Regions:
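Cell-envelope/extracellular polymer assembly enzymes that use nucleotide-activated donors
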Residues: 2-4, 33, 178
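A conserved acidic beta->alpha catalytic loop
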Residues: 38-47, 91
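Catalytic donor-sugar/metal-binding loop of nucleotide-sugar-dependent glycosyltransferases
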Residues: 147, 169-171, 181-198
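Acidic helix N-cap motif at the loop->helix transition within catalytic regions
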Residues: 14-18, 43-51
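Acceptor/aglycone-binding surface of glycosyltransferases and processive sugar-polymer synthases
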Residues: 64-78, 83, 95-173, 199-219, ...
Length: 237
């Protein structure tokens, strides 16, 4: 098994070098590559990436900013691994936790694994932001008769070919809801493991907003309606 870690990067000059160094230092139990996509950064991120060298690094760049979802698609198109794991460059997630997601796959217990965050004392989010995340997750559980703990998590480990077959079209943060919704529509229930999470504040560069939550609910509803129509026609989701 080979793992491809996909890193979308946009204006993360303060954190990207440390994020990549931390990833490179992890002792993975399988061959690994790191596909980094600079989504047309303007803050010096590109120059920092140019100075990083490792045989496991694949560096790509968008000429125009397209969004996180588009950057992940670009990374997945270039990936050569059997499994993929997105990783944000802002260091809200811990690289070492990827090992926890790999364990149930390597034991043969799961095919898709999500890292479930806890919003505790290290979170910079407001009460309403946390409730928004939980609300979107609840909507998904109701629509698809499922029970998952954290729909919006970045930590989604799955086979590369499964990701490609989902045909994700969201260019921005909506990719998280689209991936989860399309998995649930196929009756694929992710195995979940707890992970460490330390949220950034708006002042530190957090980019996601309440509008992304509204979009997530819309995407989930659309996917569910499309899935029900396909089921009535006898077409696989």
């Amino acid at each position: 098994m080979k793992l491809s870690i996909l890193m979308p990067v946009f204006n993360e000059a303060e954190t990207v070098q440390n994020a990549i160094k931390r990833l490179l230092d992890v002792q993975f139990p399988c061959p690994v590559e790191f596909v980094v996509v600079d989504d047309a950064s303007t803050d010096g991120t590109s120059e920092i990436l140019d100075g990083l060298h490792d045989d496991r690094l694949i560096k790509l760049r968008h000429a125009v900013n397209q969004g996180k979802g588009a950057a992940v698609r670009t990374a997945a198109a270039a990936a050569t691994g059997d499994y993929i794991q997105p990783f944000d460059a802002d260091m809200e997630y811990q690289p070492e936790d990827i090992l926890e997601l790999l364990k149930p796959v390597l034991r043969g217990e799961a095919t898709v694994v999500f890292g479930s965050r806890t919003f505790g004392s290290h979170s910079a989010y407001s009460f309403w932001y946390v409730m928004g995340n939980k609300g979107v997750t609840t909507v998904a559980n109701i629509l698809f008769n499922a029970y998952i703990a954290d729909l919006e998590t970045c930590f989604k480990l799955m086979p590369l070919e499964l990701y490609r077959s989902l045909d994700i079209t969201s260019d921005g943060f909506g990719m998280e809801a689209e991936i989860t919704g399309k998995l649930l529509a196929r009756q694929i229930r992710p195995f979940e493991v707890p992970i460490t999470y330390r949220a950034r504040s708006r002042e530190e560069g957090k980019k996601i907003t309440w509008k992304d939550g509204v979009q997530a609910v819309w995407l989930l509803t659309r996917i569910r309606m499309t899935s029900k129509r396909a089921q009535r026609r006898g077409i696989p989701s």
